[in-house]
C-alpha cells in the first residue's frame, strides 16, 4: 500500500529536480554564446581563449610527473608540455556551465 503512495510523489519530484538542475546549466554556441556573454558581462568580457585561473601562454602542466622514470623516457618528450587551454567554448558550448562560470569570463 505504501508503494502506491510513493510512486505519485516520485513522479512529481523527479521532473522538478530535473528542471531545477537544467535551470542552473547553460549551454550555447556561436552567436547565442556571444549574446549570453553580452548579457552576463555588461562591462565586456575576456578573450574566448583565456579564463581567470588557467595556464598562461608559456605555462605548462607536467603530465609525466606521476610516471616512474622508466615509463617517462618512453613517452614523447613534448607530451610533458601540454598546454591546457580552456575557454568559454569549452566551458559553455561543448558542455553546459553555470551562470557563475559564465560570469568568470567577464572583465572586472
Swiss-Prot record:
Keywords: Cleavage on pair of basic residues, Disulfide bond, Secreted, Signal
Compartmental location: Secreted
Protein's GO biological process: carbohydrate homeostasis; female mating behavior; insulin receptor signaling pathway; locomotory behavior; negative regulation of entry into reproductive diapause; sleep
Domain of life: Eukaryota
Record-level Gene Ontology MF annotations: hormone activity; insulin receptor binding; receptor ligand activity
Function: Ligand of InR/insulin-like receptor.
UniProt cross-references to PANTHER family, sorted A to Z: INSULIN-LIKE PEPTIDE 1-RELATED, INSULIN-LIKE PEPTIDE 2-RELATED
Protein name: Insulin-like peptide 5
Native organism: Drosophila melanogaster (Fruit fly)
Classification of source organism: Eukaryota, Metazoa, Ecdysozoa, Arthropoda, Hexapoda
Amino acid at each position: 500500500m505504501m508503494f502506491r503512495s510513493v510512486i505519485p510523489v516520485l513522479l512529481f519530484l523527479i521532473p522538478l529536480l530535473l528542471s531545477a538542475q537544467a535551470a542552473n546549466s547553460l549551454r550555447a554556441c556561436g552567436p547565442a554564446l556571444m549574446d549570453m556573454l553580452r548579457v552576463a558581462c555588461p562591462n565586456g568580457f575576456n578573450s574566448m581563449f583565456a579564463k581567470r585561473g588557467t595556464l598562461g601562454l608559456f605555462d605548462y602542466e607536467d603530465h609525466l610527473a606521476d610516471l616512474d622514470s622508466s615509463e617517462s623516457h618512453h613517452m614523447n618528450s613534448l607530451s610533458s608540455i601540454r598546454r591546457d587551454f580552456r575557454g568559454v567554448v569549452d566551458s559553455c558550448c561543448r558542455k553546459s556551465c553555470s551562470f557563475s562560470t559564465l560570469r568568470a569570463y567577464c572583465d572586472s
